[in-house]
Design a protein with these regions (language model features):
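Conserved N-terminal beta-strand and adjoining loop/helix that marks the start
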Residues: 1-17
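A structural signal for short, well-ordered beta-strand segments
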Residues: 9, 46, 64, 87-88
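Conserved Nudix-box catalytic region and its N-terminal flanking loop in Nudix hydrolases
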Residues: 13-56
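Short loop segments at secondary-structure junctions
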Residues: 13-16, 23, 91-95, 110-112
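Short histidine/acidic/glycine/proline-rich micro-motifs that form metal-
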Residues: 36-37, 70, 112-113
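A short coil-to-beta-strand element that immediately follows conserved catalytic motifs
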Residues: 57-67
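Active-site-adjacent beta-strand/loop module that shapes the phosphate/pyrophosphate-binding cleft
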Residues: 69-96, 110
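NUDIX/MutT-family hydrolases
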Residues: 89, 97-130
Length: 139
């Protein structure tokens, strides 16, 4: 059983995908999205979290990609928790703007620093996207 059940969004622009950094600049990069609240559908959660984190943007062409499970990103290396992410791909309509809970938005590409990524991105999500030819560059 996962300690955190989340919904995440994978969106591309010019061959790069959008990631965010929460809390502080030392935090790992994660996908936009968040935890599903009690009684909330996956669609409702994704829409709410994207608006909370990226501002008033709209989502189009949203489609399920897969469910991934791995160690949760943590600023404290002694904390070991499991996160499960239901990942959806989609297009953002509008300009994403970092909210109060996000300190930085990054369009991550082949020249970006992989060491900044959360464990689930490095270990599970990106290898799967490469295997499925959804990501054309190697990490």
């Amino acid at each position: 059983m996962a300690d955190f059940n989340k919904v995440g969004l994978l969106t591309f622009l010019d061959g790069r995908f959008l990631l965010c950094r929460k809390h502080n600049l030392a935090s790992k990069l994660i996908l936009p999205g968040g935890c599903i609240e009690p009684g909330e559908s996956v669609d409702e959660c994704l829409t709410r979290e994207i608006n909370e984190e990226l501002g008033e943007v709209a989502l189009e062409n949203v489609a399920y990609i897969g469910t991934y499970r791995d160690m949760a990103a943590s600023d404290d290396p002694s904390v070991e928790k499991i996160v499960e992410i239901q990942l959806y791909g989609g297009d953002i309509i509008g300009e994403p703007v970092a909210s109060s809970e996000i300190v930085e938005l990054i369009w991550f590409g082949p020249d970006s620093d992989v060491q900044q990524l959360s464990p689930i991105l490095v270990n599970k999500i990106l290898p799967d996207l490469i295997d499925r030819n959804m990501l054309t560059w190697k990490i």
